[in-house]
Amino acid sequence: MDADSDVALDIIITNVVCVFRTRCHLNLRKIALEGLNVIYKREVGKVLMKLRKPRITATIWSSGKIICTGATSEEEAKVGARRLARSLQKLGFQVKFTEFKVVNVLAVCTMPFEIRLAEFTKQNRPHASYEPELHPAVCYRIKSLRTTLQIFSTGSITVTGPDVKSVATAIEQIYPFVFESRKAIL
């Protein structure tokens, strides 16, 4: 087994965060009283609204800014955001679905081997930091892709990035480095 051979790695997207604007002022009290699956947080000036399909939680501010979390793909995030905008229109607001943007993607990938973290950190010092007293994973940053990887000794890698493409590219880039530091199978 060598690092150049094509290995099929499953990248499981666990969370997609997106933002959009409604281009109108939203009355949070009206949303709280008339909306479905709503929690009104008056002390912080926001409303939480949950959708069942797709399973999304939205944070709504009176300015019209809405953040949606919980989707498992970029398409699902957009469908959920549009569905949320439609439910606000049904409450009587003049909502226009604008400035939609995926801001964060969280994914998990499991390598088919375990990783020696101390050795990996020494070989990749400027990009990797490992503090075993504080956290059991190596934090590896790829500035060009704006991604952060948490690499665990079990071979599990958690990737945070701006979009799905950069997350997949980060996994492709990191594979040869973690392959060099893999634990020998007895």
From Swiss-Prot:
One of its GO terms (cellular component) is cytoplasm. It is found in: Cytoplasm; Nucleus. One of its GO terms (molecular function) is DNA binding. It holds the Pfam family TBP. One of its GO terms (biological process) is transcription by RNA polymerase II. CDD domains: TLF (cd04517). The keyword Transcription regulation applies. Keywords: Cytoplasm, Developmental protein, DNA-binding, Nucleus, Transcription, Transcription regulation. Belongs to the TBP family. Part of a specialized transcription system that mediates the transcription of most ribosomal proteins through the 5'-TCT-3' motif which is a core promoter element at these genes. Seems to also mediate the transcription of NF1. Does not bind the TATA box. Members of the TBP family are differentially required to regulate transcription and development during early embryogenesis. Particularly regulates genes that have a role in catabolism. This is TATA box-binding protein-like 1. It comes from Xenopus tropicalis. The lineage of its organism: Eukaryota, Metazoa, Chordata, Craniata, Vertebrata. The gene is tbpl1.
